[in-house]
């Protein structure tokens, strides 16, 4: 716990001054426990019943935060919120950060600062920082919706959405925007979305939901 607090404090200091200095770009993936590609009638029925948990993953292609280069490194945020994510929150969310195990201490602080700058208040209450191998592969399918994230106890795998097979009410759209700012992403089907670790209130396995985003990010 002491190590976690020290690293979080270092990241907070870095975040307050040079959170995205030099610019960072890379790949992004997200999955939630509710549909994000849906119609208003279905979204309204799920509000504050589901969608309180999410996994967000960033894999840096190239970038600098402060004096730390973080090329090729990744970080994942596991979030448990009080209300459906994307709606007004009545209490603070809890978050566990899974930091790339290859990063040195300066890079770890830089990755945490970067994630906090992207996810904002969702990462205001980080209850644990863990280290894991972070792999994010974005497949080259025509629609750009196929990706896979593996990071210790967190998993996401997506496929492209089909207007023919995945529509239910007929007026689906990206009802909830991505939880990370500065991303260019499209909604996708989460064929796997799970978290089996500790730190937040629940573990989950939420496959077969239109609740993912896959794309890229770039900050300046």
Task: Identify the function of each model-found stretch.
Residues 1-8:
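Bacterial N-terminal signal peptides that target proteins for export
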Residues 8-16:
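Bacterial N-terminal signal peptides
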Residues 15-23:
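Bacterial Sec-dependent signal peptides at the C-terminal "C-region" and cleavage site
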Residues 15-16, 53, 60, 130, ...:
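A sequence-level detector of short, solvent-exposed, charge-rich linear segments
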Residues 22-99:
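N-terminal Sec/ER secretory leader and immediately downstream segment
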Residues 98-217:
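Mature, soluble, non-transmembrane domains
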């Amino acid at each position: 716990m002491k190590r976690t607090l020290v690293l979080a404090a270092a990241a907070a200091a870095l975040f307050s001054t040079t959170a995205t200095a030099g610019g960072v770009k890379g790949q992004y993936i997200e999955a939630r426990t509710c549909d994000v590609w849906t119609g208003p009638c279905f979204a309204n029925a799920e509000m504050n019943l589901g969608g309180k948990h999410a996994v967000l993953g960033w894999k840096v292609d190239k970038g600098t935060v402060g004096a730390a280069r973080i090329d090729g490194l990744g970080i994942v945020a596991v979030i448990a919120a009080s209300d459906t994510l994307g709606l007004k929150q009545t209490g603070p969310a809890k978050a566990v950060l899974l930091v790339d195990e290859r990063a040195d201490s300066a890079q770890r602080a830089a990755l945490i600062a970067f994630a906090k700058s992207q996810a904002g208040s969702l990462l205001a209450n980080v209850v644990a920082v863990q280290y894991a191998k972070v792999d994010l592969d974005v497949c080259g399918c025509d629609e750009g919706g196929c990706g896979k994230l593996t990071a210790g106890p967190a998993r996401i795998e997506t496929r492209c959405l089909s207007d023919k097979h995945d529509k239910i009410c007929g007026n689906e759209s990206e009802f909830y925007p991505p939880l990370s700012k500065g991303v260019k992403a499209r909604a996708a089907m989460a064929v796997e979305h799970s978290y089996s670790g500790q730190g937040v209130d629940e573990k989950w396995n939420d496959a077969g939901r239109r609740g993912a985003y896959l794309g890229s990010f770039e900050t300046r």
